[in-house]
């Protein structure tokens, strides 16, 4: 706990291993009464969706809590107990970009679905902006592991916001307050 978190890069500059620090949903759940006694009324989580990195801003799957934090069911239990104590749970939804190692982009073929990087026929292809397919694409601050999405693409909007089972609606139903 006294050393600086680190990561190891490959020859091309890609991160191949991260150090991880921190707690999980069960740990927060165990401390809810204590947090309430301090006057806490809102808990804001940085990204907790499935992701290969320690910062979790390169989402792999918006439908799953990252296993290092717990499960979707544990998230629901946390929200239920927090609500009973008058504490709201707020999620950091990173919807301007995904991870290159995601079910949507799937650069490394780690997912069953055909990602935008793998095929022009992918249902996710139009979510991204390629300048020279497949290797050149718009990405967050030039970080290739975080390809930007076209936030106004109709199918992306439906998946994230407006669809009956959109990501936002799913997590609100699971107990998040925002």
List PLM regions with ranges.
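Substrate-binding/active-site clefts of carbohydrate-active enzymes
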Residues: 1-41, 48-174
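Receiver (REC) domain switch/active-site residues of two-component response regulators
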Residues: 177
